[in-house]
């Protein structure tokens, strides 16, 4: 199968969030399964220069002229390879749009021309597919930044020889980010205004690029089975639950996998000691002591160490941490926070660290090495999200034997099995899970974890249950292949029956 994946970011070329990890790991898994995969992303020179382990890229002879509204925009095409794979990567190089400090925002403000930038990128993907003669069986677009691609394929690409049966799959990674713009930006797309209607591209008078992808793609996916159900409800659908409900038969939830070449305690180069499920107690003890020492916390092997690596926002449940912080810090615990986000929560966590230096460490910003060390060195991991389409850190935690404490939403509900008596007896439990979005409920579950942490055999069983499951992309990639086959089948004409067939 020939597959083109289009994404606004992908590790190791650029990254702002989990989309970048998925856009890299899924193509590699598909290629390992024998498929011909091409990845197309923008080239962000300033970000690329700062990416650790960024691979070399080279110029190609291909130059694109892309229509954006009434003007033509020139771009170069660079070429690289996803490390550890045979996945070809084409990077669209257009400095006016992409040679910036950020991908979508700068100084906490969205770029005012984001619509124009990603309309350009979507059209550049189509032009690259044509000029490179890729002839894909399926084009897989991701989130609002590439939401125009399914519409362009439906309206324009099907007129091209060899591309008339190309199918489209559109993945929703987070309903909260929809790419909503002034209605007059519709002219940038180059599509007829007849498509600016409530069934396709219009949302309460605005152009909505996420809705565009949802409307035009042959098959839709999102990043966990539970989230696929949630987004068809008013609570989680962010205003698009109606159109998602109307396409329920075309919507598939697939839990993301983990790139275990990067995230695995047996091979992780950032750890004080590598370990496996067979020596988890010894390995994690060494990693815990190293983490406590690095962060200036007292090295106490028997105190439960809770960690968080996250955007510090309300969506990630930091309001709950604030609600229960005082009573939590009355307990004999240590807390480690790594991340950035809402200044209110950054200040809260800085203040907790200043007031309780023997119990709390707060690092504002992102550090790849430290994020691995937090996953390996902590005993438990906090993810009390208000909503969570998939989540990756809870799966990293399970792989590393770090017991997750999560709210049962989205992918968290699909990956973490609560340590109830029944689940423990069945050997299924791997963490702690709760439903109410309240600080006292989070605190109660942290107390549950503290109590079970003192019961070493039961705690070890929780760790080993999580570590023994295959969290890699192998199974998720196979599910995507079935989705691609389904999309392709919708675009292939039914064979005509001969006269003697009944």
For every predicted segment, state its role.
Residues 1-502:
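Catalytic cores of nucleotide-sugar-dependent glycosyltransferases that transfer UDP/GDP/TDP-activated
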């Amino acid at each position: 199968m020939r597959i083109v994946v289009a994404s606004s970011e992908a590790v190791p070329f650029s990254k702002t969030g989990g989309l970048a990890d998925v856009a890299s790991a899924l193509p590699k898994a598909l290629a390992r399964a024998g498929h011909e995969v091409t990845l197309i992303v923008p080239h962000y020179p300033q970000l690329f220069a700062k990416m650790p382990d960024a691979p070399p890229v080279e110029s190609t002879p291909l130059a694109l002229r892309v229509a954006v509204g009434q003007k033509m925009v020139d771009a170069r095409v660079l070429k690289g390879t996803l490390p550890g794979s045979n996945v070809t990567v084409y990077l669209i190089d257009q400095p006016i749009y992409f040679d910036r400090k950020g991908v979508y925002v700068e100084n906490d403000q969205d770029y005012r021309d984001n619509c124009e930038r990603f309309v350009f990128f979507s059209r550049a993907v189509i032009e690259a597919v044509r000029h490179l003669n890729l002839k894909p069986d399926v084009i897989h677009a991701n989130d609002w930044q590439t939401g125009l691609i399914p519409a362009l394929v439906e309206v324009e690409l099907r007129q091209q020889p060899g591309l008339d049966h190309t199918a489209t799959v559109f993945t929703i990674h987070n309903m909260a980010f929809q790419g909503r713009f002034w209605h007059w930006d519709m002219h940038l797309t180059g599509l007829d205004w007849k498509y600016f209607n409530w069934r396709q591209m219009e949302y309460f008078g605005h152009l909505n690029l996420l809705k565009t992808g949802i409307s035009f793609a042959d098959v839709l996916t999102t990043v966990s089975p539970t989230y696929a159900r949630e987004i068809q409800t008013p609570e989680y659908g962010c205003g698009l639950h109606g159109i998602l409900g109307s396409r329920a038969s075309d919507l598939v939830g697939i839990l993301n996998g983990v790139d275990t070449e990067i995230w695995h305690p047996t091979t992780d180069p950032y750890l004080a000691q590598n370990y496996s499920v067979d020596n988890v107690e010894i390995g994690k003890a060494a990693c815990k002591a190293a983490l406590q020492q690095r962060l200036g916390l007292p090295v106490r092997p028997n105190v439960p160490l809770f960690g968080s690596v996250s955007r510090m926002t309300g969506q990630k449940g930091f309001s709950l941490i604030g609600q229960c912080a005082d009573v939590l810090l009355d307990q004999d615990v240590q807390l480690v926070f790594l991340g950035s986000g809402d200044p209110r929560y950054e200040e809260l966590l800085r203040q907790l660290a200043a007031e309780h230096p023997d119990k709390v460490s707060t690092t504002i910003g992102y550090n790849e090495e430290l994020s691995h060390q937090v996953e390996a060195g902590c005993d438990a991991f906090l993810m009390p999200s208000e909503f969570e389409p998939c989540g990756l850190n809870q799966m990293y935690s399970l792989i590393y034997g770090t017991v997750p404490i999560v709210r049962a939403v989205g992918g968290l509900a699909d990956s973490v099995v609560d340590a109830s008596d029944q689940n423990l007896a069945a050997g299924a439990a791997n963490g702690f899970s709760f439903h109410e979005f309240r600080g006292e409920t989070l605190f109660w579950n942290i107390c549950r974890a503290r109590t079970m942490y003192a019961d070493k055999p039961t705690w070890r069983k929780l760790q080993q249950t999580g570590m023994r499951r295959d969290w890699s992309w192998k199974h998720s990639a196979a599910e995507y292949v079935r989705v691609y086959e389904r999309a392709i089948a919708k675009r292939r004409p039914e064979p005509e029956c001969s006269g003697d067939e009944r």
